[in-house]
From Swiss-Prot:
Its EC number is 5.4.99.25. GO terms for biological process: mRNA pseudouridine synthesis; tRNA pseudouridine synthesis. This is tRNA pseudouridine synthase B. Disulfide bonds: none annotated. The lineage of its organism: Bacteria, Pseudomonadati, Spirochaetota, Spirochaetia, Spirochaetales. Keywords: Isomerase, tRNA processing. It catalyses: uridine(55) in tRNA = pseudouridine(55) in tRNA. The gene is truB. InterPro entries: PsdUridine_synth_cat_dom_sf (IPR020103), PsdUridine_synth_N (IPR002501), tRNA_psdUridine_synth_TruB (IPR014780). It is an enzyme of class 5 (isomerase). Belongs to the pseudouridine synthase TruB family. Type 1 subfamily. GO terms for molecular function: RNA binding; tRNA pseudouridine(55) synthase activity. The active site is at D39.
Amino acid sequence: MENGFLLINKEQGKTSFETLFPIKKYFNTNHVGHAGTLDKFASGILIALVGKYTKLAGYFISLDKEYVAEFRFGLETDTLDSNGRIVNKADYIPSVEDIDLKLKDFVGEIYQSPPRFSSIHIDGIRAYKLALNGKFFEIKKRRVNVYDIQRLSYDFSSSSLSLKITCSKGTYIRSIARDLAYSLNSCAYVSNLKRTKIGMFRLKDSTLCKNLSKSSLISLESLSSFKKVYIDSSKVNLVKNGAYVEVQININEFKILKSREGEILAVIEGIGFNKYKYVIIF
């Protein structure tokens, strides 16, 4: 079975799950997952994990993200995107000066309520399923970090604002659109969304599913953030059997264990000072 990860350019109109179908077919395995859902209406980079690399989903999900988004003022949909039903209208369209002033309030550590149409679990049920059934529910605000927001353009005549947003995991761009508009006494939805970066991985280096090849599969050794630890031959079997060997590691740090001959043996994650757990054993 193949093991590795892929940088996929997800197209609009497909769910992240649907995007995996051609990958499963190409590599002839159902052992394929993704790290970080990208909404159906959105496009951009999606990290797909193949084989044992599915166990690294948590690492990839934790990486910071970059988006290019387009907000349209004056209308709000129930989904806060272009696929939703219009539920609110506003005559007031903010000026670019007012927008620039308010954008500053959305940089840094902020609290936001995820959209009602989202994958958040509410008592074990996805929020979007409750919303589709007209159920009343509340979603608690969550703390996220927005590192930078750049205004790329603003067309007052079409009420369209284009932004580049760099943020932490769990940040909802649709919530930023909603909350920014409310702070300006207007309303808005996200008319277009493209994820351009996940951690060090950029959209320009991704591939469309129709262009998949064996060379598209990336190994851990390409990740500079994963330091390598070489294991003496006398301890290789210990690692292969999941036994503890002495390794210097910090909490939340990932390391690759390799044999002196260059064979990748395992991936470990620090859970304390010089304490770790096995994430993958090859």
